[in-house]
Design a protein with these regions (language model features):
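Metal-dependent nuclease catalytic cores that hydrolyze phosphodiester bonds in DNA/RNA
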Residues: 1-83
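A substrate-engagement module of RecA-like helicase motors
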Residues: 179, 238-347, 352-355, 413-440, ...
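A contiguous, basic/glycine-rich beta-loop/short-helix subdomain that forms a polymer-engagement track
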Residues: 325-347, 357-365, 527-644, 649-654, ...
């Protein structure tokens, strides 16, 4: 069987035919709309007659000496009418269609590809192409037509294939090299207990095209145990690309280190770490246009040379390598990285590259079809709250008022005059009414025919356009005034909601608000498209509001029974309306269907059925509990039965007893400890008491602050890492004479920056104390979640409070014992941990927990250290 190189029609034309500058001033709103126009596609397709075929799959195969190039895609529509064939390419946009004088070249090229493929298949001598642009808000439609002879299309298309041939040759040759190396690749270590079975579970899941949920305790080697079998599956054509997605930067580095290790063992595999635009941008401000950024100017003229140079020299596309080549070729490093991902075998990045409805990688997932991809989701317990966040949308009343003030203050009358002159100059001429026949009868709207640049253009007024404020789309008041009026209408609706809100309130119908919001969105879009002389500050603020509004309207269209709409009065006095995605299951599942298989893993996936349910798992998907490889004798877990963090029992006496517990635990062994508290306020109370009554000269305390920059965080952690290379066994073996003289105690907050994702090995951390059960603070969203899941037949308190809280506890406890050589203690300070409702959530390796009191804990700790020392002799 000949090898294949596959590419979509869209990727082919965008990659080969692009040129010029990056310019988000004109591309931003239009391109975002193009990706969000699925509703428009369906609407137009439904209105067409029987002669209209929607979503027609087309494929072209081009043989070479060694392999075949397959170009494939879906034509939005094919119209067979009166013996003629028309290829319909639909594009949604927020732009005023009266100002769209010609279709975009890349859109024409995409339609021409479909026209050639269909003509070749049906042996048509000529064919018509129609570009259908539809305004998403008003549903106005503008058609552009062009007729092509097959012979002309063939010459054009074959030149396109010829230009792509260099890239296809490289892709095929690299794939052959990669597959051969995968076949010879062996697991780089001796398998730990249970690790071989875990590797097998991952491979079988990919084979069966399922999802796998893995509870993987620290030390299992979850990164290599998921990446290795996925790479082996790719060697059997069960995956073209591996996506390793995580919420934290440090785990992305671990994934790249794993690929590097496998490359050292002979694997030929190109990997890339995708970095956020704000972090990798060379400029102080991310102004992506040729006037503000030299890397944006002419970017598309140079980018393909940069890609080919790096591709043929490197296998690991790290941030530093991307920046090096971006500087060499003067291209945008962010867009450079995205383009390189098309040629990478492994793509490492944030969750949002797959799951975020606005940021996902459209070059892979934009056409809605399933790719031959495998998704590895690390620290997947974080995906639940991230999923809720990505698929929810707030709207603050104060944002509208602030924008209104700014519009009045900063947009000058001269700008309005210039805009009016431009509108007058571009006024509509040469219009004539056209009586519609045939398929047009499906669209009983106002029709106008125009001739522009020699191309037939048809304008159709949409139903929603007629429902506006009675003003023609062609004649507008000043933009600033129009924006101000619409902001006032929106604010009036929000003010009415605010009067009815006491704390927070669930709401049902917000259509009266959405209508002016939709119009406001369209007017801002027009303004951003037309005004080239807006100050940077005004444009930046307008764009920021515009994208927030885009997100809100998109989520409004998306909402279903998994959403709750509510208003609330915020602590800072502001008023907010929120579309709250209480259950992200369906949205996340839809994203995972973009690939062949998904492996989700975490050290704190308990209870696993809870996560499987809310993260899009099905009954036929798998779950597995990986066996812990650590020696249980190297750890002791103690539960206090005489203190609690319950709000109803908080008192100076309770705070004192908790501070005393800390003292009784740390006094038996000098070393590094972290104490985790339910809140900053609680932590500060305990710290003050500890400092006053218990702190000794041999102890030093570090206290987490509410806002710590990266430098302060690193300082905090580096104080603990000072002894990372020390051998704890030898230190303890020296007993009293050589024992560490200093104790370092970190006072931290549960669920904060030090409670998850930090790796303190060996003597860097020998003890963790967790104060409280980690229950989230009672608030409107937690109560909404509780009520929703109670109504859904689940335990609302568990889903909203207990499970999220326990996850934070397990994450904090997991900061100690990071390697097989580590020794340490875990102390849980809350009597609720002795209840079954919490004990049932303990991981299997926590079977041997011991109850203590403030009077007995010191003896228990001393016995543990002495017993371990005696055992090691």
């Amino acid at each position: 069987m000949a090898g294949e190189v596959r590419i979509s029609v869209r990727n082919l034309v965008e990659f080969i035919l692009r040129s010029g500058d990056i310019d988000d001033r004109r591309q931003g709103s239009l391109e975002n709309a193009m990706q969000e126009g699925s509703r428009i596609h369906r609407m137009i397709q439904r209105r067409m007659g029987a002669e209209y075929q929607a979503e027609v799959a087309l494929k072209y195969t081009h043989p070479t000496e060694d392999y075949v190039i397959i170009v494939e895609g879906r034509a939005d529509g094919i119209i067979e009418q009166n013996g003629e064939t028309t290829i319909d390419e639909i594009k949604g946009t927020y732009r005023d269609l009266s100002k769209l004088k010609a279709p975009l070249p890349l859109h024409i090229a995409q339609a021409k590809c479909y026209a050639y493929m269909y003509s070749l298949q049906k042996e048509l001598p000529y064919i018509r192409v129609r570009l259908t642009y539809c305004n998403i808000e008003t549903e106005d439609i503008r058609y552009f037509y062009e007729d092509y002879e097959f012979v002309r299309l063939e010459v054009w298309f074959q030149q396109l294939i010829s230009d792509y041939r260099k890239w296809a040759d490289y892709t095929w040759q690299w794939r052959e090299l990669r597959q051969q190396s995968i076949a010879e690749l062996q697991f780089p270590f001796d398998y730990r207990d249970g690790q071989k079975e875990l590797v097998s579970y991952v491979y079988q899941t990919i084979y069966h095209k399922r999802k796998l949920f893995i509870e993987a305790p620290t030390g299992v080697g979850k990164t290599i145990s998921t990446i290795f079998p996925t790479v082996k599956a790719m060697g059997k054509d069960m995956g073209d690309k591996l996506f390793y997605l995580t919420a934290k930067t440090i785990t992305r580095t671990v994934a790249e280190d794993t690929f590097s290790l496998l490359r050292e063992k002979g694997l030929r595999f190109k990997s890339i770490i995708l970095t956020a635009k704000e972090k990798i941008c060379f400029q102080e401000r991310t102004e992506c246009n040729p006037e503000q950024c030299p890397y944006a100017k002419g970017h598309f003229d140079r980018i393909n040379d940069a890609i080919y140079d790096l591709l043929t020299r490197e296998e690991s596309f790290t941030r530093s390598k991307i920046e090096e080549y971006a500087l060499k070729y003067r291209v945008c490093p962010f867009e450079f990285g995205l383009d390189l991902s098309l040629f990478a075998d492994g793509i490492i990045g944030d969750y949002n590259y797959l799951f975020d409805p606005h940021v996902y990688l459209k070059r892979f997932f934009g056409d809605g079809s399933q790719g031959n991809y495998v998704f590895l989701i690390d620290e997947a317990h974080n995906l639940l709250e991230r999923g809720r966040e990505m698929y929810s949308a707030p709207l603050r009343k104060e944002d509208l008022l602030e924008l209104k003030r700014e519009i009045k203050q900063t947009i000058t009358s001269e700008m309005e005059e210039a805009a009016q002159k431009k509108r007058d100059k571009d006024g509509i001429s040469g219009q004539m009414t056209l009586e519609m026949t045939g398929m047009s009868k499906q669209l009983p709207q106002e029709i106008t025919l125009e001739e522009t640049d020699g191309t037939d253009s048809l304008y159709v007024r949409g139903h929603k356009g007629k429902k506006s404020d009675g003003k023609s789309t062609f004649v507008r008041e000043g933009y600033a005034e129009r924006i101000s009026q619409l902001l006032e209408k929106c604010n009036a609706q929000l003010l009415s909601m605010k009067r009815d809100c006491d704390g927070y309130r669930l709401v049902d119908d917000i259509d009266m608000l959405v209508q002016p919001l939709t119009r406001l969105h369209a007017v801002i879009s027009d303004y951003l498209e037309e005004q080239e002389k807006i100050s940077l500050e005004v444009r930046e603020n307008l764009l920021d509001f515009y994208f927030k509004l885009s997100h809100f309207l998109d989520i409004y269209e998306r909402q279903d029974e998994n959403y709750v709409k509510y208003t609330r009065l915020c602590e800072d006095g502001s008023f907010e309306l929120k579309l709250f995605c209480v259950n992200p299951r369906e949205n996340l599942k839809e994203c995972m269907l973009r690939g062949r298989s998904t492996i989700l893993f975490s050290a704190t996936f308990l209870p696993i059925q809870y996560y499987k349910n809310l993260l899009g798992g099905e009954k036929e998907d798998y779950e597995v509990y990986a066996h812990s490889v650590f020696d249980p004798e190297k750890r002791t877990i103690l539960i206090a039965g005489d203190v609690t963090s319950k709000f109803s029992r908080r008192s100076q006496e309770e705070y004192y007893n908790i501070a005393r517990y800390i003292h009784e635990v740390v006094k038996n062994r000098h070393g590094n400890y972290m104490i985790f508290f339910p809140s900053y306020s609680f932590m500060n109370h305990i710290y003050e008491i500890y400092e006053q009554y218990f702190m000794t000269e041999e102890e030093e305390c570090l206290v987490q602050q509410e806002s710590m920059n990266e430098e302060e965080r690193e300082y905090f952690l580096n104080r603990f890492r000072g002894n990372e290379e020390c051998d704890l066994q030898s230190l303890i073996g020296m007993e009293i004479e050589e024992e560490e003289e200093q104790t370092l105690i970190g006072f931290c907050v549960l669920g904060g920056i030090f409670g998850e994702g930090i790796d303190l090995k060996r003597d860097s951390l020998i003890g963790v104390i967790v104060v409280g059960t980690g229950l989230p603070q009672v608030g409107c969203e937690r109560e909404i979640l509780k009520g929703y899941f109670d109504e859904d037949g689940e335990n609302g308190f568990d889903y909203s409070y207990r499970y999220p809280g326990m996850n934070k506890v397990l994450q904090a406890a997991g900061r100690v014992i990071r390697t097989a050589e580590d020794v340490g203690i875990i102390v849980l300070l809350d009597d609720r941990f002795q209840q079954y409702s919490y004990r049932r959530l303990f991981p299997r390796e926590w079977e041997q927990v011991q109850p203590v009191t403030v009077d007995t804990v010191a003896k228990k700790v001393e016995r543990f250290w002495d017993a371990w020392l005696w055992q090691k002799g």
